[in-house]
Amino acid sequence: VHPWDLKALDKLIVMSAAYRQSARVDSQQDPENRLVARGPRFRLSAETLRDQMLFLSGLLVEQQGGPSVRPYMPEGVWDETSRYGDLRGYKADMGSGLYRRSLYTIWKRTAAPPNMTLFDAPNREVCTVKRSRTNTPLQALSLLNETTAVEASRKLAERILRDGGTTDRQRLAWGFRLVTARLPAETELQLLETGLQQDLQSFTAAPEEAQKLLTVGATPAAKDLPAQQLAAWTLTANVPVDSSG
């Protein structure tokens, strides 16, 4: 049907009914999935997870081709393995280089991007036929604190506040569906609503903490939204992003 058109073949596969099965587990219907009654349940790969965060936030730069880029990385990440030249003193790009697809991230095998290796990206020292897939507390902490995750959550929060509706529940449901491609259950909505109110109270009592959170990342925070409100929604927007990873 699609001779040598791999992109068309991939699209055909991912849009098929078999590929788009629900991953919800049913204790009564094929609980062990021996009959393939549901889709597999696993987190996104390292590159896809980062790209999804950038896309949802509106930060993703979809330019194709060009040289490698240098997104955010911990300070001094290259210094321990290089003592001279361009491979010492890692410095992140400014502007669009921070938001290109992970495919274009510069890769140093002796000091690979920590946020990639943390989510089981191959180290590129040898060929990898099949990636390992782990779920660790450190991965969740990374999605809560890493610069790209926090900045993307803030921009996603701005998007939710502007486009998600007029009430908190409307916005929470809209943002949840945007990230997970499904509507939240009532219990999930209640948990998000409770967390939002707690965060809002905390930032109202400590506005300096709200300002500190909004300075994470190179993209400035929206000036037309109250700082405490935006900070609270930043943490709330991070929840479905974290859970989807």
Question: Can you say where each PLM-predicted feature lies in the sequence?
Answer:
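Amphipathic alpha-helical segments within well-ordered protein domains
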Residues: 1, 141, 157, 173-180
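Residues at helix-coil transition
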Residues: 14-15, 145, 180, 197, ...
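C-terminal structured "cap/appendage" subdomains that terminate the fold
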Residues: 164-234
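Loop/turn elements at helix/coil->beta-strand transitions in domains of secreted/extracellular proteins
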Residues: 2-11
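Short, solvent-exposed turn/loop segments enriched in Gly/Ser/Thr/Pro and often Arg
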Residues: 12-16, 25-26
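Short, basic alpha-helical nucleic acid-contact segments in DNA-binding proteins
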Residues: 1-3, 19-20, 199
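An acidic, gly/pro-interrupted, aromatic-rich
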Residues: 7, 20-171, 219-245
